[in-house]
């Protein structure tokens, strides 16, 4: 059987770093208040000339180089983002042009913070269906440009960045010891769409709008939804939390991460945390955390890695991958 194996990984961050203390002159907050409630200490903010496309292209180049490939080897460019450069054409097409890719196809996918999980799952389906051999999967965001910088409950939470992986078709044996994606589960529930959303768009207000969030409601639902979809992945494979080498969750809030790991009985030392230095980068969150753990040597070939995310909609999902 065909498996989708991670061949390469890369990331990119804006130059500017904004620390918690930098917010003290903008809104009524403090470093202590932010750290206690979120675990965030700093985040990267896009500056002039830095966009979702430029960050996504930089991460993509790094992933292709890490894979030992050329841009011409890529069949599909799949970008998860909620902050595209333009309403259309797709920012994935712009990245395709930046990389000099003239074959295959490219499109954007939008599932907010769950976007990268949705994108990996979609890429896996294209690979196993024979429509693509190598897929560039990117999560890239510039959430700083949809924030209300007078709202202290949201402006301190988010950052900008991009991460990317190259997925490649490989022969597997149908075993959980195979390298590649072993299971993926996605969910959504539109009944919660007004708990986390942007209050504008081309079809309604003809404006970009700002991010709005009912933080307590999001927190209340997050842990249960995350653990439910992860347990479905365990059930599909016969694996358990004890088999997990690394848990790479969406980096939204350390309290949510800690509560999810505890409910799943995943040891703290197996959890990859980057929310302290990146903040919530939405669809870029999981690939940025993955890239960090690969670069520092924690995630190694053969490791069983659990990815998960939850975002506006609500959308949520999980992926089990043998590295």
From Swiss-Prot:
CDD domains in alphabetical order: KAS_III (cd00830)
**EC top class named in words:** transferase
Gene3D superfamilies noted in UniProt:
3.40.47.10
What does the record give as the reaction this protein catalyses? malonyl-[ACP] + acetyl-CoA + H(+) = 3-oxobutanoyl-[ACP] + CO2 + CoA
Please give the GO cellular component terms listed in this UniProt entry: cytoplasm
Taxonomic superkingdom:
Bacteria
From the Swiss-Prot or TrEMBL record, state where the protein is found. Cytoplasm
Q: In which pathway does it act?
A: Lipid metabolism; fatty acid biosynthesis
> Does the keyword field hold Acyltransferase?
yes
List, from the UniProt record, the residues annotated as the active site of this protein: 113, 250, 280
Any idea what job this protein has?
A: Catalyzes the condensation reaction of fatty acid synthesis by the addition to an acyl acceptor of two carbons from malonyl-ACP. Catalyzes the first condensation reaction which initiates fatty acid synthesis and may therefore play a role in governing the total rate of fatty acid production. Possesses both acetoacetyl-ACP synthase and acetyl transacylase activities. Its substrate specificity determines the biosynthesis of branched-chain and/or straight-chain of fatty acids.
Give the multimer and partner information.
Homodimer.
- Entry's free-text remark on domains: The last Arg residue of the ACP-binding site is essential for the weak association between ACP/AcpP and FabH.
Q: Which family does it belong to?
A: Belongs to the thiolase-like superfamily. FabH family.
Task: Please report the name of this protein according to its UniProt entry.
Answer: Beta-ketoacyl-[acyl-carrier-protein] synthase III
* Phylogenetic placement of the source organism: Bacteria, Pseudomonadati, Pseudomonadota, Alphaproteobacteria, Hyphomicrobiales
* Gene from which the chain derives: fabH
């Amino acid at each position: 059987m065909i498996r989708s194996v991670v061949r390469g990984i890369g990331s990119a961050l804006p130059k500017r770093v904004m620390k918690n203390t930098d917010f003290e002159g903008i809104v009524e907050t403090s470093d202590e208040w932010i750290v206690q409630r979120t675990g965030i200490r700093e985040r990267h903010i896009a500056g002039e000339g830095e966009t979702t496309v430029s960050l996504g292209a930089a991460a993509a180049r790094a992933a292709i180089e890490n894979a030992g490939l050329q841009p011409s080897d890529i069949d599909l460019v799949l970008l998860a983002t909620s902050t595209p450069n333009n309403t259309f054409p797709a920012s994935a097409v712009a990245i395709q042009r930046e990389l000099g890719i003239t074959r295959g196809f490219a499109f954007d996918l939008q599932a907010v913070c769950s976007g990268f999980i949705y994108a990996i799952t979609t890429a896996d389906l294209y690979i196993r269906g024979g429509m693509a051999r190598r897929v560039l999967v990117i999560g890239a965001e510039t959430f700083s440009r949809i924030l209300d910088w007078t709202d202290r409950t949201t402006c301190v939470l988010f950052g900008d960045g991009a991460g990317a992986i190259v997925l490649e078709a490989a022969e597997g044996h149908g075993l959980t010891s195979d390298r590649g994606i072993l299971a993926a589960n996605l969910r959504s529930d539109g009944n919660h769409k007004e708990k986390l959303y942007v209050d504008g768009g081309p079809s309604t207000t003809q404006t970009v709008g700002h991010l709005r969030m009912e933080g307590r409601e999001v927190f209340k639902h997050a842990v249960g939804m995350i653990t439910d979809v992860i347990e479905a992945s365990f059930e599909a494979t016969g694996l358990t939390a004890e088999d997990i080498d690394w848990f790479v969750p969406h980096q939204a809030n350390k309290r949510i991460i800690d509560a999810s790991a505890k409910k799943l009985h995943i040891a703290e030392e197996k959890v990859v945390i980057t929310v302290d230095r990146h903040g919530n980068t939405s669809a870029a969150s999981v690939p940025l955390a993955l890239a960090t753990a690969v670069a520092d040597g924690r995630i190694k070939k053969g490791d069983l890695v659990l990815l998960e995310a939850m975002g506006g909609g609500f959308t949520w999902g999980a992926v089990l991958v043998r590295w």
